Amino acid sequence: MLRFIAGIFFGLTTLVAADSFDVCVYGGNASGVMAACAAAKEGAKVIVVEPSRWLGGMTGGGLMHIDWGREEAVSGSTRPILKKDHKDAQYRAVFAEMLQAAGVTVLFEHRVGAVEKSAGAIRAISLDLAPFDETGCPPAAPMKAGARVIAAKVFIDCSYEGDLMARAGVAYAYGREAKSTYGESLAGAQPPMSIYAIDPYVKAGDPQSGLLPGLQSTPVAPVGEADKLTMGYGFRWRFVFKGESLPIEPPANYDPKQFELYRRAFQQGVDILSGRVMRGKVDGWEKSGGRVYSGGAGNLARALFAPTNYGHNAGYADGDYATRARIWKEQQDFVRGMTHFLRTDPSVPAKQKEIALSAGLEKGAFDDTKGYPHQLYVREARRMVSDYVVTQKDMEGKAAPADSVGIASYGVDEWPYATVPLDGKVALMGGYYSMLYLEDEHRGIYRIPYRSIVPKKDQCTNLLVPVCVSASHIAMTSIRMEPVWMILGESAGVAASLAVKAGTSVQDVPYAELYPKLRALTQKVDLPKKKETKPK
C-alpha cells in the first residue's frame, strides 16, 4: 500500500539530509514521472522532488481532455498510459503505482531553494519545506528553509517553471520573441483577438478615473515585436450542475466591485455564460485581426468572460515564490468570486443566476482540496536557450535534426495575454490558434532534438530539461502538450542513466547509444511515413 505523507519521502528508504542519488528529478508532473521511471528501469537510483503533494501535474490536475495532435506521434511508454483516458484521480494513482513499481523515492512539498555547483555541474540542491494549503495553493514563504539537501550525479528539471534550470545558471527566455529573432512569421505580439464594446474605465468615458478591475495597463508591444507577456494561466475546474457536489465558497476577500465588467456586459445583453454567444454575433461585439477562434468550446474558454483572468499572471514566469503564490491564489479567488457574484448580485439576469446557483464542484476529482483543482495551468513559463533552439522552421519541416528524442505534432496554440483598454473599449490581446500544420504537406509532425533538452555545456554538464526545452515561444505553443513533455521526459531519463553509467556529461552522451534504447521503448524519434498519419 502506498503511503502519501506530506513533507516526507515514501518508498523503501528513509532519507537523511544530503542523501545521494544517481538521478534527481525535480517535478513530479507527468513528464517527471516518465523521466524517473525510465532512469530507474535503466538501473539508476532515483528520487522525485515534487513541490506539491500530488503527482501528475496537469495530467492529474484537471486537464481531462489531453491534446495529442497526430495520434501516431505519441509513442513509447506514454502511449498506453494516455490511451486509457483516465480521470484526474486515476492518473495520480497510476503515476504513484509506476513510481513505486520502479523503486523510485518521492519527496512531496519541498521546492528548490538553492543550488550548489562546482566545476560546471550541480552537486546538490537545497530544498525548502513548503506545504500547499487546504485549497491546493502554494505558500508565499516556506515552513522551513533548507529542510533537505539532495545530491545527485544527474538532475532532470521537469518543472513547468524551470526553477532548477534557472537557479543552476542556465540561460533562458520568457515572453514572446520578435519575428526577427528567429525569422518566424508568427512570432511577436499579435493584434487583439477580440474587442468588446464595454467602457473600460471606472467612470465611463473618463480615462483619468482609472481602469475597471480585471483590466491591466500592461504595455503591449507592436505587432511582430517582442514583449515579456505570457499566455493566460488558470485552472481546469470540475463544475457540475446536477446531483451531489462540493460547494463553491466565496473567497474571504470577496468584493462585488471586482466584477463591474460583468455588470456592464449584462446591461448590454451579453450572455456571459453561453457558448452560443461566444460563437455568434452579438451587438457591439467585434472581431479583430483575424484572431478570433471558431468552433468548439475554445471560443468561450478564450473569451473575455471565462474562468481565467487573462493578463493577471504577469510576473509569474520569472517571479519569486511569493509572487507566484499570490497569482495562484488570485486565480482561484477570481472564479470563486465570479460564481458568488453571479449568484447574488442584483444585476445578474434570472437565467444566469439560476445556472450559477446550481453549480458545484465534482466529487472525486479533488476531494482533499475541497474540490478546487490543485494545479495551476502554467501553459508556458521559462524556455531554455541552448545550442539548438526549436523554432517555427522545425514545425514547418524545414529542419531535420539528426539527434531526435521525440516528435511533436500540435499546431500553434496560444491563449490571450492581457485584458486592456483600447480606444474606449475592452480588448483581449494576442493569442493565435492554428491547426494549419496538421494540414501542411509535412503533416505537422516534427522532431525534437536531444540538443534542445540539454544546456550549453559551459553552463551545466549534468542537467536535462525536457519541459522548459530550448525553443522559441511559437514552437513552445506546440511543444507544450502533455504527451510531448511525457515523451521527452522518458527520453531524458534514459539519457540521464547513460550519463551516470559512463561518468560523462549529458552533452557527451552518444546518440548512437541513446537511439536504440529509445527505440526499444517503442519511442518514435523518426518521422512516420505519410500514410500513417491521422489527427486525434
Place the predicted regions along the sequence by residue.
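Structural recognition of the beta-strand scaffold that forms the well-ordered cores
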Residues: 24-26, 47-50, 57-59, 65, ...
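Conserved N-terminal/central alpha/beta ligand/cofactor-binding core
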Residues: 38, 44-45, 49-121, 152, ...
